[in-house]
């Protein structure tokens, strides 16, 4: 038991000696005072807040090192037009250029090259165009006449039907009038025939009575 206590005390003394030696002799060790200490070189954070605007970087197109690359600027240049890999001649060409467009827009007339035509399509270019147009005109006129004839026939038939219906109606009304007149005439004849018979019967009854007897004369 005593041996353990002595060993513990020896270790504790050795540890304290080591700590004291480090704190007194080694100045480069970590110290909390160094972290808290404020020096003149350290400035506040808000003093360093500054805004910097960077100039936008402009990207330039790389140089066209190869002549076969596609470039939109080449489409606007008439001098670099190619035909089957060969450059067209600048003068004496027979193509359609911007000059022709300027002439058309400016009010001038397009003047094509010799032997190439103006690109316009006329009636003389196609010999069958006149025949087709004439056939279409005849067909249109014939169809119009047929429609007019059909309309006239249908209107005439409807008119005749209406006329026939009205004639039947008038005939029926006239027949009814005749029947009414005939009935009235028969009634009048019956009345005329009945009155004389009544008078005759009255006279006949009077004549049938015997005459009164005369009294005897003295």
From Swiss-Prot:
First and last residue of the signal peptide: 1-25
Pfam families on file: CD99L2
Family: Belongs to the CD99 family.
Functional note: Plays a role in a late step of leukocyte extravasation helping cells to overcome the endothelial basement membrane. Acts at the same site as, but independently of, PECAM1. Homophilic adhesion molecule, but these interactions may not be required for cell aggregation.
Superkingdom field: Eukaryota
A single GO BP: cell adhesion
Stretches the record annotates as Disordered: 72-128
Cytoplasmic compartment segments: 158-218
Glycosylation site positions: 129
Biased segments, Basic and acidic residues type: 76-87, 110-119
Membrane-spanning intervals of the chain: 137-157
Species whose genome carries this gene: Pongo abelii (Sumatran orangutan)
All ranges on the Extracellular side of the membrane: 26-136
Membrane topology, from the record: Single-pass type I membrane protein
Entry GO terms, CC: anchoring junction; extracellular region; plasma membrane
Subcellular location: Cell membrane; Cell junction; Secreted
Protein name, UniProt field: CD99 antigen-like protein 2
InterPro entries: CD99L2
Keyword Glycoprotein assigned: yes
Keyword Transmembrane listed: yes
UniProt entry keywords in alphabetical sequence: Cell adhesion, Cell junction, Cell membrane, Glycoprotein, Membrane, Proteoglycan, Secreted, Signal, Transmembrane, Transmembrane helix
PANTHER family in UniProt: CD99 ANTIGEN-LIKE PROTEIN 2 (PTHR15076:SF12), CD99/MIC2 PROTEIN RELATED (PTHR15076)
PTM: O-glycosylated.
């Amino acid at each position: 038991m005593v041996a353990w206590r002595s060993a513990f005390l020896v270790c504790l003394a050795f540890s304290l000696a080591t700590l004291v030696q480090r704190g007194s002799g080694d100045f480069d060790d970590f110290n909390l005072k160094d972290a808290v200490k404020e020096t003149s070189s350290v400035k506040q954070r808000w003093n360093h807040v500054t805004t910097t605007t960077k100039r936008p970087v402009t990207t330039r197109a790389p140089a066209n090192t190869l002549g076969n690359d596609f470039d939109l600027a080449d489409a606007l240049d008439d001098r670099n037009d190619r035909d089957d890999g060969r450059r067209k001649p600048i003068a004496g060409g027979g193509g359609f250029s911007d000059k022709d467009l300027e002439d058309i827009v400016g009010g001038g007339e397009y003047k094509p090259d010799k032997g190439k035509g103006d690109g316009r399509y006329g009636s003389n270019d196609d010999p069958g165009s006149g025949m087709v147009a004439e056939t279409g005109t005849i067909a249109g006129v014939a169809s119009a006449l047929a429609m007019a004839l059909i309309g006239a026939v249908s209107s005439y038939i409807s008119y005749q039907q209406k006329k026939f219906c009205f004639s039947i109606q008038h005939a029926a009304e006239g027949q009814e009038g005749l029947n009414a007149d005939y009935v009235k005439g028969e009634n009048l004849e019956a009345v005329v025939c009945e009155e004389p018979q009544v008078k005759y019967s009255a006279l006949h009854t009077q004549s049938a009575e015997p005459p009164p007897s005369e009294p005897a004369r003295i």
